[in-house]
Amino acid sequence: SPEGFYYVKDGIDQAISRGLAYAPFADLIWCETATPNLEEAKKFADAIHAKFPGKMLAYNCSPSFNWKKHLSDDEIATFQTKIGMMGYKFQFITLAGFHTQNIAIFELAEKYKKEGMTAYSRIQQNEFAREKDGYTSVKHQREVGTSYFDAVSNTISSGKSSTTAMEGSTESEQF
């Protein structure tokens, strides 16, 4: 290429070749497909397992796939079970948090424009309701470790720090 790279022929055969080359040295082998494709996933898994039985595989249930364009609702619902049976033990969605955060804040912005603080308060009430299920981010200062940094500051200053954040904070008083 003009940048000095070598061109390679991509595709499942090249992925299998690389997977087999790395298998002796890797804990698990990851194959990236262009679409959510069970046939390619099986071909890759079968080829790796033929030479390395039981080798764990990884599959990116990618946000770059238009899932509904390629699969029915039933196929989407069973996709992970099916690849799991092929040996794909590590299944993940790259950038799931990115997409989830962005659609959530976009929807909040739309509602905030129309409803003002009521829109945000509704989200906050949902956070409170979800604490019983293990949700912990209501107390955002705690979540980001503010108490830890307060302890470090107090340790360094022999308990005389004037820049701590938690003691007397709105979070400690209201939540």
Q: Residue locations for each model-derived region?
A:
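Alpha/beta enzyme core
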Residues: S1-F92, I105-F106, E110, T146-F175
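P-loop/Walker A phosphate-binding loop and immediately adjacent motor/lid segment at beta-alpha junctions
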Residues: D46-L57, K114-E115, R122-Q125, A129-R130
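Short acidic/histidine-rich active-site segments
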Residues: I93-F98
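C-terminal helical cap(s) of enzyme catalytic domains, especially alpha/beta-barrels
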Residues: N102-T118
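Flexible C-terminal active-site loop/helix
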Residues: G116-E167
